[in-house]
Amino acid sequence: MYASARDWARFGQLLLQDGVWHGEHLLPEGWVRYMATLTPQSVRRDFGAHLWLKVPPPFDSPVKPGPSLPSDAFHVVGHEGQFVSVMPSRALVVVRLGLSRGSHVWDHDAFLARLLEAFPPVKPD
């Protein structure tokens, strides 16, 4: 599916808001939580219902262990390194539309970790 970065960001925002858009439930309540829950059949223990719970190879960090991302992070992964990454605990949606071919040409784990370092959580007043 082809869409603009803005459209993908809206999709990520819809997931971040548990399927609610402008006060209207577009997805059943709890559906996103279900999508972001580990599927028992996931051999590598990293896949939910159409969402990756960890950055999949070859876009994960070649350094082991890789950078630490929030435990509630999940990812929609597209063709050759396109990502919509959602981190509910940080109220953050990140879209990447780059084209990456080959092994470990894009380290999405490290990119997200650097982004989180650059924008620390806001402390409530």
Feature names for model-found ranges:
Residues 1-20, 82-98:
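Active-site-proximal alpha-helical segments within enzyme catalytic domains
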Residues 18-19, 39, 119:
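A general structural signal marking secondary-structure boundaries and capping sites
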Residues 9-16, 32, 36, 52, ...:
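Non-transmembrane alpha-helical segments in soluble domains
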Residues 4-8, 31, 111:
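Stable alpha-helical elements in mature extracytoplasmic
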Residues 37-93:
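Active-site Gly/Thr loop motif
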Residues 1-3, 24, 41-43:
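Short, conserved, surface-exposed binding loops centered on an aromatic residue
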Residues 73-125:
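Structured C-terminal helix/loop/strand segments within mature extracytoplasmic catalytic/sensor domains
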Residues 19-28, 104-105:
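Structural helix-adjacent loops and short alpha-helical linkers that scaffold large soluble proteins
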